[in-house]
Amino acid sequence: MGRRFLRGILTLPLRSVLQAQHRMLGSEQDPPAKRPRNNLMAPPRIGTHNGTFHCDEALACALLRLLPEYANAEIVRTRDPEKLASCDIVVDVGGEYNPQSHRYDHHQRTFTETMSSLCPGKPWQTKLSSAGLVYLHFGRKLLAQLLGTSEEDSVVDTIYDKMYENFVEEVDAVDNGISQWAEGEPRYAMTTTLSARVARLNPTWNQPNQDTEAGFRRAMDLVQEEFLQRLNFYQHSWLPARALVEEALAQRFKVDSSGEIVELAKGGCPWKEHLYHLESELSPKVAITFVIYTDQAGQWRVQCVPKEPHSFQSRLPLPEPWRGLRDKALDQVSGIPGCIFVHASGFIGGHHTREGALNMARATLAQRPAPVPLANAVVQ
């Protein structure tokens, strides 16, 4: 069992990764032709959303493509309902969770499923993302394949639980905006940090070859790449963003008389850390509550400022009745025409126009008792 275990772990994922280099990647910019349903030789399609991508759908797609039936699958990145309807399986988009039709979205207001709710007896109560849903429904089969054993093998049960608790749950929690800490106890494990990945390059206790030289070279390559990537980010993205945030703060009263709404000239820039630092330096009378900006598609976003830099709790979330709604349903409840969505946790929403995004922020401000002062505020 030991050799078969290691052979399954070390060879099958690598083979799948190498094969993936030669597969097509569908996109909104280059839309795929609709797959003829009667063409049994056509490769399967995995649908997910286009635009900014996140760890959960990347992991969901990667897990699926490790399975034989999806090994040659085409990834179709779109939000077009007709194109998604032509896909064999859809993850993280579509507003539907239906394993019978292979639809695995978690953004809809009605979705509250956890590993515990769908697998009675499991202890984990973190809301599932698309990664967790795919892992829940396909994980045992995938692990059995990678381990070179059957799904009935007790090893699969053990590894299934271990991989969820120490890998997938973290992805679920982060994507759903769930804080790791509550009452001093961690809700889920964080095991994919750079230090942890370097540590895992060391030989395991039961590997015949305990030489660390090759692993150390790989570790150097790993940390060098991440160091240079981070340096490049700070130099070319993070630092220039400070000037944009500083200018936005200076112009905030031209955006709204409350002074609580900031408009970024360029969307997508890393603004949060700069905002906290600048608030500390400038000591505005009230806290900045919302940031509005355009996304990659040219639509407008209204994002709530978190209470703290790494918190998932907002200073003022968008109204509860709006959360998890989209399009006309959201228009009706909010009274603001042209809405696109509000996230289920209320930390972000979308609108087709700048004025609409502003109105979403203003309507939220109007519903709270009083502005939120900063602890170090001084009168301006």
From Swiss-Prot:
Tissue: Ubiquitously expressed, with highest levels in testis.
Protein family (similarity comment): Belongs to the MYG1 family.
Protein name per UniProt: MYG1 exonuclease
UniProt keyword terms in alphabetical order: Acetylation, Hydrolase, Mitochondrion, Nuclease, Nucleus, Transit peptide
Cellular location(s): Nucleus, Nucleoplasm; Mitochondrion matrix; Nucleus, Nucleolus
Pfam families given in the database record: MYG1_exonuc
Any single GO CC term annotated in Swiss-Prot or TrEMBL for this entry: nucleoplasm
EC number: 3.1.-.-
Transit peptide feature range: 1-46
Record function comment: 3'-5' RNA exonuclease which cleaves in situ on specific transcripts in both nucleus and mitochondrion. Involved in regulating spatially segregated organellar RNA processing, acts as a coordinator of nucleo-mitochondrial crosstalk. In nucleolus, processes pre-ribosomal RNA involved in ribosome assembly and alters cytoplasmic translation. In mitochondrial matrix, processes 3'-termini of the mito-ribosomal and messenger RNAs and controls translation of mitochondrial proteins.
The organism of origin for this protein: Mus musculus (Mouse)
Top-level taxon of the source organism: Eukaryota
Modified sites of kind N6-acetyllysine: 266, 272
